[in-house]
Amino acid sequence: MDQDGITELINKSEITSVVDSYFRALDEKNFDAQHFASIFTPQAKVTRPNGASLIGPEEISASHEKSFTRFEGSQHFVAGHHISLDGSTANVRANLIAMHMWQGSKTDANKLDNFFMAGGVIHATLVQSDGQWRISQMSNAVLWRAGGFRDMMQTGTATKKA
């Protein structure tokens, strides 16, 4: 493999790591704005499944923190990262399965609505600046849902509709 091929593999590995770091932060409830600034560009846009848009690392982290207080825990599985590179810009398509357990759900394991799952496709654009890849735009197209979806219509604050 030549140097260009090696550089491409390194970039794709770094891009995958950034995308995975975002979902890991959600699962670990690490909503520190400084941490989100290492994942997102200053004007990054995250479009939620309901069409609401969040702009910038601070708004993204604050909105997720507010939204995720409803959950006892969550787990996001991101796989099949397909990455197209064009210089310092990358486009990513990946599959996502997310499971969320409602607060208090551990108190009654027999309840059928103590969790919900959703599966879909994420699309993201990342840009490389000063040797670091960061997400500049991300959206999640939900393809299916299962479980107790009762409270998910309200997904936190947002500044704009997409």
Where are these regions (language model features)?
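Short, low-complexity N-terminal intrinsically disordered segments enriched in polar/charged residues
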Residues: 1-32, 38
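Short, hydrophobic/aromatic alpha-helical segments in well-folded domains
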Residues: 18-22, 79, 121-125
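Short beta-strand segments enriched in hydrophobic/aromatic residues
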Residues: 26, 40, 96-98, 139-142
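A solvent-exposed, acidic/Ser-Thr-rich amphipathic alpha-helical stretch
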Residues: 32-102
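Transmembrane beta-barrel outer-membrane domains
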Residues: 74, 115-117
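Short beta-strand edge/turn micro-motifs at domain boundaries
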Residues: 91-93, 117-152
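Short, surface-exposed loop/helix-turn segments at secondary-structure junctions
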Residues: 104-112, 152-153
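Extended, polar beta-sheet/loop recognition surfaces of beta-rich domains
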Residues: 148-162
